[in-house]
Amino acid sequence: VSDLDANSLEAPIAIAVLTHIVRSIVDDADAVAVTSGPGKGDKILLEVRVGPGDLGRVIGRRGRTAQSIRTVVRAAATNDDVDVDVDFVDA
């Protein structure tokens, strides 16, 4: 049994920051979709879907771009008083 309710799965600032960053990186900004759901423990999982061919651009060389995005979004999530994990998925 989890003590999380539906309202605690919201991270509007983190989602807005994540969406803005990813849309500025990819070629097809309209194909970017961010969904949120329960993650491990008390974390919220933010799943990013990008258009075909854009996943490599978001992940970057050796995953450095993806790791940087995760770091910035986790910092933004502190304004939402939540912990987040970010996963990148090819649509």
Residue ranges of predicted features:
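RNA-contacting regions in translation and RNA-metabolism proteins
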Residues: 1-55, 67-91
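Glycine-centered tight-turn and secondary-structure capping sites
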Residues: 59-63
